[in-house]
């Protein structure tokens, strides 16, 4: 997406805190502000969704619960209708069904982001299993 110049007037305290945080994260104030706006709007639009992780690896999650991609990955593994899968996952995890639905709604609005996380995790699992197999072969 192309960047456009936009002007904001910030109070001294907001400006100071923005610049201090950006410096701690090693990014520009503009990059931090953009991330905060996107994440802030997402959390306003999707009740129960928060962002966690380091600045370079932010991911959507349920407040006090798993990451959204983890919920979607598990729902895919389950069988049944959407509501049956939600009920099963809620019973397995003690995550309220409404929060599972919130995660699913977020994922529907951000499919590329969630799919990327799922694929990356599946790749890491495959690589880990292969490395374990190779270690066992060395010791056989």
Question: What is each residue range found by the language model?
Answer:
Residues 8-10, 18, 25-38:
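Short amphipathic alpha-helical segments
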Residues 27-28, 90-102:
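Short, basic interhelical loop/turn and adjoining N-cap
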Residues 46-51, 112-128:
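Short Lys/Arg-enriched helix C-cap and helix-to-coil transition segments
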Residues 65-82:
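Short, amphipathic alpha-helical "recognition" segments used to contact nucleic acids or chromatin
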